[in-house]
A protein has these predicted regions:
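PP2C/PPM-type serine/threonine phosphatase catalytic domain
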Residues: 1-243
């Protein structure tokens, strides 16, 4: 890309006692990756979810910086495999961390290609004249929808939407999804936790992202939108303009 600018913000929301969302936003190289964006939404009692998301972000950066692998998918797959194993060990060693885990959605732009890795239900979008979800939710309701056993937006959907089927640190192995998308310029990249997407319609998100305001203003407006609509969860947002 000729230029890439990004802004990030996380907020506790209006109802949660602690913020279990973590993020990392770098337009500068991280190891062999020319840039790196990550959002993680932790789960677990006490401070376990907070620890899981923060540790995952921190350790992913460390492992990516040290990686001797060459292609983005290999770098990311090996890093998250190691992080998953380390988190499992920590949960076995410390009962306060039992049951912890975290979602992870991650993006990097290499030349004119977007690489996305996803585990759980935090999301990555590409936005221009339309809003396009790149990542795929690993959730109980999405599996039922895929089998034709549930309708998106139904009462049952909202009751069970937060049950995720994949997470970092929750199972002995972790299976991320990878997506590779060509870029043409003029797109906006959005990574966020469900604290935004559960509180805001896609079109309202797209309108803010494409409003023409400066990056910091638009990023803050997305967080404000989630809080204005109830702020029932922590909110993490990374917004990047791809030119």
């Amino acid at each position: 890309m000729s230029s890439l600018e990004a802004c990030s913000k996380t907020d506790i929301g209006l109802e949660r006692p602690i913020n279990q969302d973590s993020l990392f936003c770098s337009t500068a190289p991280v190891g062999k990756l020319p840039n790196l964006f990550m959002v993680a939404d932790g789960m677990g009692g006490h401070n376990a979810g907070d620890y899981a998301s923060q540790y995952t972000i921190k350790k992913m950066v460390e492992l990516i910086e040290k990686s001797t692998l060459s292609d983005p998918v290999s770098i990311l797959r090996e890093a998250v495999r190691q992080v998953n194993g380390i988190l499992l060990e920590k949960s076995f060693e410390d009962e306060r961390l039992r049951g912890m885990g975290t979602t992870l959605t991650l993006a990097t732009v290499v030349d004119r290609r977007l690489f996305v890795m996803n585990i759980g239900d935090s999301r990555t979008y590409l936005i221009n004249s339309r809003i396009r979800q790149i990542s795929r939710d690993h959730s109980f309701v999405e599996e039922l929808i895929a089998r034709g056993e549930m309708t998106k937006g139904s009462e049952e959907y909202w009751k069970k939407k937060n049950i995720i089927t994949r997470a970092v640190g929750a199972y002995t192995s972790v299976v991320p999804d990878f997506f590779e998308i060509p870029l043409f310029g003029g797109e906006h990249l959005l990574l966020c936790s469900d604290g935004l997407t559960n509180m805001a319609d896609d079109e309202d998100i797209r309108e803010i992202v494409c409003s023409g305001e400066d990056l910091e203003t638009r990023t803050s407006q997305l967080v404000d939108l989630a809080n204005r609509n109830g702020g029932k969860d922590n909110i993490a947002v990374i917004l990047a303009d791809l030119d």
